[in-house]
């Protein structure tokens, strides 16, 4: 019995766990997290760089020689998210003039036709009176005044790589200047959904205006608006 008591009374030594595997996992998680955040910030910086345009150069020849319109001031270049808090309007309320800022023949006309097929109001095509040397080195610019912020917001949903530029115009018309990097209208499925929802809202707006009621703005998901502009530029 004494032997049995001695066996059960023996203190079992504490087995110390080696911390190395847990430490390796922790380090790996920290490194992975750092890589993910680097990619996030890198992608933001990349798209900011891709959507930033050069300032216009001075005219190389006077208008009477070049055949170009007299150069006008550019306006203020804005951040890509400058209109994120602005409510878009239906595309048929957006009067868009497409400008040739890159020297590509007939491109502005074809883009204007494509915008019309998406429901935008045609404002014609013309040569750019800001980048008169056709030296717009980016995807393009959306130019607007204070009255055209909502219209510019709508256009930016299907031209998410274009830089936003605010100028001193007084009407709600918007200019879409095409740059050297422009390849096509980038209409995501989410952007098409937003345009359709805006068009579906028009009868409600017209009814409220006809009844002299306060117009309820369109209810568009913020997540949908964000995804509409989530493209590679």
Q: Which stretches of residues belong to each language-model region?
A:
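Residue-level signal for protein termini and structural transition zones
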Residues: 1-233
């Amino acid at each position: 019995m004494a032997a049995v008591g001695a066996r059960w009374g023996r203190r079992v030594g504490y087995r110390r766990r080696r911390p190395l595997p847990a430490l390796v996992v922790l380090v790996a998680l920290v490194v992975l997290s750092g890589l993910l955040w680097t990619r996030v910030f890198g992608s933001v910086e990349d798209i900011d760089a891709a959507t930033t345009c050069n300032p216009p150069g001075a005219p190389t020849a006077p208008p009477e020689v070049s055949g170009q319109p007299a150069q006008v001031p550019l306006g203020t270049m804005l951040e890509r998210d400058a209109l994120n808090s602005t409510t878009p309007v239906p595309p048929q309320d957006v009067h868009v003039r497409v400008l040739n800022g890159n020297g590509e023949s007939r491109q502005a006309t074809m883009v204007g036709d494509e915008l019309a097929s998406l429901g935008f109001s045609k404002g014609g095509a013309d040569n750019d009176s800001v980048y008169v040397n056709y030296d717009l080195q980016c995807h393009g610019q959306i130019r607007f005044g204070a009255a055209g912020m909502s219209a510019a917001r709508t256009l930016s949903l299907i031209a998410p790589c274009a830089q936003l530029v605010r100028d001193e115009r007084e009407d709600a018309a918007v200019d879409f200047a095409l740059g050297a990097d422009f390849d096509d209208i980038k209409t995501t499925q989410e952007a098409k959904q937003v345009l359709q929802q805006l068009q579906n809202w028009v009868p409600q707006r017209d009814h409220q205006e006809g009844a002299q009621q306060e117009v309820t703005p369109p209810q568009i998901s913020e997540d949908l608006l964000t995804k509409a502009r989530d493209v590679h530029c």
